[in-house]
Each structure stands twice: as structure tokens, then as C-alpha cells.
Amino acid sequence: MGMNNIRSIIRMIILESVGVQGFKMIFLAGLPGGGKSTLLKQLGIQNQFTTCNIDNFFEPKLMDELGTKNLHDFSERFFDLRAIRDGRSLTPEELEEYEGVKALRGKERTLFRAAINDFKAQVNEICAIGSNFIVDGTAANYDQITSDAERFRTAGYDCAMIFVDIDVETSKERNLQRGREGGRAIYTGIIDDQATRLPGHLEPYREFFGDDRFFLVPNKGTFDEYKENIEQIRPGINAFMGA
């Protein structure tokens, strides 16, 4: 029996176990440090989904190859030195440092491409077998997200998006703090770029997913206010899960 046939049988068994509701997938979107794990925990749905996040594959590769998950520091130094180079010749010491951080950025890109391939393989495997899943990311690339959503819909998934709206400066500070504590920190310039693109995507996302499948959760105040905002989407999430 081929692997595709085995997957089809498993899929039918799971479909029978969940009844006519079928499978759900959620794009969990927003800038880094938005409190997305808090949202899932408060809603109590995290155990009903497999969470797919490139970081799950990227971070181990970073530690194995670079010995750090803090990508901000050497990236910032790279751009600082490049700016100096554009104005004058680098000293021998600066040139050596520049080549070093440039090499680190090259390794980072190679590792990220490998992590993307692993991430895509995980998503494809879940779709082939059939299971609820969450794609955790920023959703800054509108065309990619909507293309993926169409593919998941074709595979029989009911798709939604939860977008956590956080202030860009708060996102950058939490990103840097995570790096200081040994976690992964991306170059803050990436967050600035994402923050300029995301606001223009919100209404298109709402139109694409529909009012009953797009949930915007502001997180620009106190933690208690954020928890209250999460509660505001609970009825809609419950309706989505039960549809």
C-alpha cells in the first residue's frame, strides 16, 4: 500500500472522529512579541491544533551552526560597518570585522532557507494526513498568505486569521529583550519593514477571510486590557470552531 493511500485512510478515520465539521486552520499573525502564545492559552484552543512555526526549525539550526539565536547584534554591526564603508575605506580591523559579520549573515540566510523547507514539509504532511493546525508568523506577505489559504481551502480546510496588533516600538523592545535573555532576536530593521506593510494588509485580510473568520486583537495597552480584548473574540472563535 502506497504512502498516499495510507494517508487517505488515516484522514478518513480522523474525519469520522470529528464528524462533519472537518478541519480548521488559523493564521496567527502580527509583529514579534505580540503575546500570541498568551492568546492561545487564554482561549484554550492550543491543544486542538498543531502549531507550525519556522522558528521551531530555525532556532536549533542557529544554535548548532552559529552558537546563538541573537541575530540582531551582528546584523546591526554589519549595517553600521557597511555605512562606514560607503563613506570611507574601512581600517584593516574594521574590514576583518565586516567580513566576519557578513559571513554570519550569509550562514543565517542559508539556515533560514533550510528551515523554510522543513516548515513547508511539516505543513504539507499535516494537510496530507488531515489535522487542525496553526501557522504562527507575521503575515507581512499578503500574497503568500492568501495563496496558502486558497491551497488549504482546496484541501478542505476552514481557514481563519487572528491578528494581534502591537505597537512597533514595543515589538522591537521585546525582541531585543528576548535576545538578551538567550532567545531568538531578529534584526529590528526587519520589524520596522514589517510594521510599514502590515497596516495596509488588515482590511484586505478582513475582506479575504470574511468578518466571521478575521479576528483583530489590539495589544497596545495594559496586560489586563489585552486579556479583555482576547475575550472579545471568544464568541467568534467558538463559532468558527463549531462551524
Task: For the regions a language model picked out, list residue spans one by one.
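Conserved GTP-binding G-domain of TRAFAC-class P-loop NTPases and closely related GTPase folds
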Residues: 169-243
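The conserved Walker
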Residues: 31-32
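Short hydrophobic/aromatic beta-strand immediately N-terminal to the Walker A/P-loop
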Residues: 26-27
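Conserved phosphate-donor/acceptor-positioning beta-strand/loop module used by diverse small-molecule
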Residues: 140, 153-175
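Conserved substrate/cofactor phosphate-moiety recognition/catalytic segment
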Residues: 40-131, 143
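Phosphate-binding P-loop
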Residues: 17-23, 125-127
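Protein-protein interaction and targeting regions used for scaffolding, dimerization, and localization
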Residues: 1-18
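Conserved glycine(s) of the Walker
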Residues: 35
